[in-house]
Amino acid sequence: MAAARPIILRFESRNGQFRLSVSPQEQFPFLKEKILENLPKDVEPSSLVLSNKPIGTGGQERQLKDLTGVSIERVGLKHGDKLFIGYQDKQASQAAPAQKHVTADVSRRLNGAPVPETETVAFHPPTSPSATIKNPWEVVQQSPLDDMLDKKDGKIYRPRDPKMCKHGPKGMCDYCMPLEPYDPKYLAEKKIKHLSFHSYMRKVNASTNKAELKSSFMPPLTEPYYRVRRDCPSGHPPWPEGICTKCQPSAISLQPQEFRMVDHVEFASPDLINSLLDFWRKSGAQRLGFLYGTYEEYTEVPLGIKAVVQAIYEPPQVDEIDGITLHEWPNEKEVDEVARQCGLEKVGVIFTDLLDAGRGDGSVVCKRHIDSYYLSSLEIAFASRMQAKHPKPTKWSRTGRFGSNFVTCVLSGDEEGAITVSSYQASISAVEMVRADIIEPSAEPSVMLVQSEDEDTDNKSRYIPEVFYRKINEYGVSAQQNAKPSFPVEYLLVTLTHGFPTEASPIFPASTFPIENREVIGESQELRHVAKKLVSHGDPDKAIREVSDFHLLCFLHSLSMFSKEEEALLCRVATTHDPTEGLKLLNTPGWATLVTVLQESGERPPKRPWLNPADPPRPLSQQGKRHLPSRPESPKSESEQLAKRFKGASLE
């Protein structure tokens, strides 16, 4: 049998392309030497990978060493076919085998300036926009609220107009037919500035998927991507060593966002705001807290969503008169778990920006107004990072996520000197520009700076595309402006409405336990506060009511006295206020352990059983005294009991 005629195979790596003349009966491992001759000298031979598609794009990637016994003709390769090669260099293989690989050539920017070797990617490691999910509507798990809003038709129904409608009661015309939730005339009439997320999604879907065309469904939403693609199929070295029109982002044209992910922020009780303001009133320093609550339907806007805030948790921080410095939050996951068991989630952040006016009437200085700013560039960057950490899962996006429901609230003074709440979100473009390290805050709070590739102060490698925005010039004409070096922050901001319910019904009505991380103003969370709140009064019904405090639940969780089932019961009692569940809680081993610990620490509960609710609680007015009473007549007297209690508490 005559030997098969040799064929030409094409190979492509990030260093370029080359051809090899091979025999169809030749096995793949025997090609190693020929392949290495066409690659850089520092390639690790054992890391060679072959694929039928560009490396990292979902092709059938196989290690060359694993193809022992597999011939070229066996896999169906023919004359002129192309294979893609991936590899690691020796230095990268020894230091970090899982990292991306770069060649030993000097990396340079687009302007020719060399890139330092120690540069790293900023913020989050860039991913590729091509990493989409196949059929996301079958895989992505949305929130129950989104599923419920998806099932609604969203139409705005109108009654028959007696002046314009000429038909009968069962007819319909242009003057009474239902409107789409994104109808511009209806929104202008109701003074709705932004579309709700689901209204915007249906507006985009109406133009993306037309039922009359009977084409396959395509997810209508796509998040912007302003970073360099890392899986470019052109075959050039990855950025910053190489770039082309396929992998570089297009120019950015900023414009006000027409929709918002959340339409309204509702605080379950005014006490939530007052407790945060108390810190400023006592110290004069600013304060920050994270909002925990739920997302519900907002009926004032078509297909609207509102964030209902039920609790504010204040993380470790250093507070000053003109700002806040956040510290590491070691128990964040534990607090999130307590909130989850209560049916809550982290919905946003709130901070104060207050300065007393000095008039003695409680008025504050108005810093934020139309002639200054509403949210500073630093605060927008902070809000963008928070939203990037809390993406919104949705089956209507190709990547399975789109935007974020995370909100940002500010307590500041209005034009009348009163303290008011303002609610905002950073736009989708702002979040991506912060991810891509394109913008940075400015010392002037009303403008945002555009980064420059030449700035190496942060030791970062980044690609900065062109950024433009439109403004009304001195001639009254809308003109496009280059955003470099800075542009107004209003292009990155979305305003929300806020308010309080007509009748407050918070799920934590007994929020009197000391708030965490307030030692700087002399407030701390101690066992004596737990005893005073839960057991000192001797009333089981009151104990069930008093456990309904989010700060108390977090403190009890940190004590690790309850099992998972008991803690779930504790959170259920705190949110439902069910007396039957409360009695189950009082009879659990965890509750008995808590009472024992309070007793051993000097916070002794009553000796006798629970008192009759009709009986008044025992007075504890002498609890703060340190002197011992006079010698009692009987060792069983109340004075001796108090003396023993104070002695046990002397280590405070």
UniProtKB/Swiss-Prot annotation:
SS bond partners: none
Region (Disordered): 601-652
Domain of life, per lineage: Eukaryota
Transmembrane segments: none
GO biological process: mRNA transport; protein transport; ubiquitin-dependent protein catabolic process
Role this protein plays: Involved in the import of nuclear-targeted proteins into the nucleus and the export of poly(A) RNA out of the nucleus. Has a role in the endoplasmic reticulum-associated degradation (ERAD) pathway.
Protein name: Nuclear protein localization protein 4
Organism: Aspergillus fumigatus (strain ATCC MYA-4609 / CBS 101355 / FGSC A1100 / Af293)
Top-level taxonomy: Eukaryota, Fungi, Dikarya, Ascomycota, Pezizomycotina
